Amino acid sequence: MSDTNKQVRVRFAPSPTGPLHIGGVRTALYNYLFARKMGGKMLLRIEDTDQNRFVPGAEAYIQEALAWVGIVIDEGAGVGGPHAPYKQSERKPMYREYAEKLIAEGNAYYAFDTSEELEAMKERLKAAKVASPSYNMVTRMQMNNSLTLPEDEVKRRLDAGDEYVIRLKVPRKEEIRLNDMIRGWVVVHSSTIDDKVLLKSDGMPTYHLANIVDDHLMEITHVIRGEEWLPSAPLHVLLYRFLGWEDTMPQFAHLPLLLKPDGNGKLSKRDADAGGFPIFPLDWKDPASGDTWIGFKQQGYLQEATTNFLAFLGWNPGTQQELFTMDELIEAFTVERIGKSGTKFDINKAKWYNQQYMRQLPDETLTRLLKEEADKHQAKYDAAKLPLIAQMLKERLTFAKDYWIEGQFFFEAPETFDEKVASTKWNAEAVTVISAYKEALAAYTGEFNAENVKHVLHEVLEKADVKIGKIMQALRLALTGAGAGPDLMQFIEIVGKEEAIKRMQFALITLSEKVNS
């Protein structure tokens, strides 16, 4: 096993077959937090052995996504380092060397089977009621490979350039044990493992061989990856042993699955599409189909909120604290506090995190975001009043775009009114008070500020013998079109005397039929 005195080295090793799923970002984040906590290094390796599934732009997307959530790569693709190259397609020659070593020592073999022969084998096993037909320790002895063919025939085929793959020779009747950092001891019998292909006919390695060779050569001490790789872990343990690297084998930690919001099954792109929430960190456009998906960033999620949300998808600090800076996450993070069972993907929790972080933004940032939203809608405004509006609305924000959704009435007079509020709060008494208030404001000649317009309102209410609570929603309705919102007196100060009077007059005319109905 890995030497506990060595510097911790972890890697994130995605395949450039499309955009990086948010679950992949979580895996990268856990690797990063662990490396930083242990004073170690974080590597990025691109596992592009499957050239048929390679997608242009995917590698750049991966690097941009990791940078956006605050992950700093110490070594690897895009950075360089002593173990370059960090793309598996550029390391192709070295994998053959290790595959041939496995053959020479009796732990792998050449397999010359055609696709037709492989299909015939599967059909034969299905007919014999074998539940999961596979190329394994039993069926390999009935196939065309270097275990069944004479040595001179194998040599002839190799010399002739016949197509072949190299398969792992899984031992018979053996228990393979793995002590996972999250799940504890995992014990698998070798009879359940098939003879996986290690080197494909095009000379490219499969994931199983390439990741073992690269992890060893890059001195990886801990492999933190998704639960979907747990069934392959015993196979990887065998490879470490067969290659003579058992003593330096990294420690494994297999992360719990990200589940659908209802908890029934693994989270997928289809679930995100159906639920109307993002599943990729950044916008993505498929270069083949032209289909597009919006990312967390472009939907308005802040980097800090997204990172915090992802950290809690399977891990918890064991305290009541929920908001963490990256440095605080690093300090608190331990693999031992990662759960074994799958975690529901709760987009409402992601929104909650964004709300908290929006409220913590500096005043100048909030003002800038408000200005950007107002400019998008070509609104007219007094720039000097924007900081106050930004502060008044910040408690109502989930995303920056909510500045317009929640505060459009600061910039534009309402043309429609909340029907529910109008039907319950707009009555003869409200009309009398609002009419009187409109006239009182028109006659008022003092400084027009929140405190003074409130004083004028109280004078009107006292004369009419009406409690403020009875007409406040109706007054807000007249001024903003809604029944709830920020401080109304401050609002009146911001829009100004002339605009406030004009809005009340419009409401009195437009809603007058409510009184008579």
UniProtKB/Swiss-Prot annotation:
Predominant subcellular localization, coarse grouping: cytoplasm
Cellular component, GO, one term: cytosol
Residue pairs linked by disulfide bridges in the UniProt entry: none
Coiled coil regions, renumbered to chain: none
Extent of the signal sequence: none
UniProt entry keywords in alphabetical sequence: Aminoacyl-tRNA synthetase, ATP-binding, Cytoplasm, Ligase, Nucleotide-binding, Protein biosynthesis
Pfam families membership: Anticodon_2 (PF19269), tRNA-synt_1c (PF00749)
InterPro entries: aa-tRNA-synth_I_cd-bd (IPR045462), aa-tRNA-synth_I_codon-bd_sub2 (IPR020751), aa-tRNA-synth_I_CS (IPR001412), aa_tRNA-synth_I_cd-bd_sf (IPR008925), Glu-tRNA-ligase_bac/mito (IPR004527), Glu/Gln-tRNA-synth (IPR000924), Glu/Gln-tRNA-synth_Ib_cat-dom (IPR020058), GluQ/Sye (IPR049940)
Motif residue range(s): 'HIGH' region: 14-24
UniProt xrefs under Gene3D superfamilies: 1.10.10.350, HUPs
Keyword Aminoacyl-tRNA synthetase recorded: yes
SUPFAM superfamilies: An anticodon-binding domain of class I aminoacyl-tRNA synthetases, Nucleotidylyl transferase
Matches recorded under NCBIfam families: gltX_bact
Subunit structure: Monomer.
Family recorded in the similarity comment: Belongs to the class-I aminoacyl-tRNA synthetase family. Glutamate--tRNA ligase type 1 subfamily.
Purpose of the protein: Catalyzes the attachment of glutamate to tRNA(Glu) in a two-step reaction: glutamate is first activated by ATP to form Glu-AMP and then transferred to the acceptor end of tRNA(Glu).
The protein's name in its UniProt record: Glutamate--tRNA ligase
Organism: Cytophaga hutchinsonii (strain ATCC 33406 / DSM 1761 / CIP 103989 / NBRC 15051 / NCIMB 9469 / D465)
